[in-house]
Amino acid sequence: MSYVIRDAVPADLPAIREIYNDAVLNTLAIWNEQTVDLDNRQQWFDARQAQGYPILVIVDDADVALGYASFGDWRPFEGFRHTVEHSVYVHPDQRGKKLGPKLLAALIERARGCGKHVMVAAIEGGNAASIHVHKQLGFVTSGRMPQVGIKFGNWLDLTFMQLMLNPGALPPQERGQ
């Protein structure tokens, strides 16, 4: 089977919602406990589009989304405007097929193309597979916060990793850039 990574379109939102809701219900990849409806995903899609941020999907030969990736603002303050936090989710039937790393690699290139300087990953501390993938793609661990989250009745540690997208670049000199 071959895979293609492309920009998401509204027709992908049902598959994105299904993948997201599975992560909510069955994994520690996201610490939300409530599933979302299609309207929620549409609002999320529209907000990403309005900000000029990508949503990528990896699709099979039938053009069905098997995973998705996106990034958004790290924090809502001007001083962080060159730093983004990403998310990557893969359909449960497709995990272990290296789709996540492919999506993340494509997303990194998009962030570079957008002129971003740092990409942040916030990963559940016990997710060794995700931490390993991030290390393979050049991320370094920048911190660990013990017991800052809770899901499925357990305290969760948060590992922060970051990737310098354009090391050595000088900061923009114009105000507001």
PLM-predicted stretches and their roles:
Residues 4-16:
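A short beta-loop-alpha structural element at the N-terminal edge
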Residues 12, 98, 127:
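Conserved G/P- and acidic residue-centered "switch" motifs that form tight phosphate/ATP-binding loops
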Residues 18-35, 48:
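Helix-loop element at the rim of GNAT/NAT acetyltransferase active sites that forms part
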Residues 34-93, 104-105, 164-165:
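Acetyl-CoA-dependent GNAT
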Residues 70-73, 120-123, 135, 140-157, ...:
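Conserved catalytic-core motifs of GNAT/GCN5-like acyltransferases
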Residues 96-109, 132-136:
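Conserved acetyl-CoA-binding loop-helix of GNAT-fold acetyltransferases
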Residues 111-123:
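Conserved GNAT acetyl-CoA-binding A-motif
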Residues 167-177:
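Acidic/histidine-enriched, glycine/proline-rich intrinsically disordered or flexible terminal extensions
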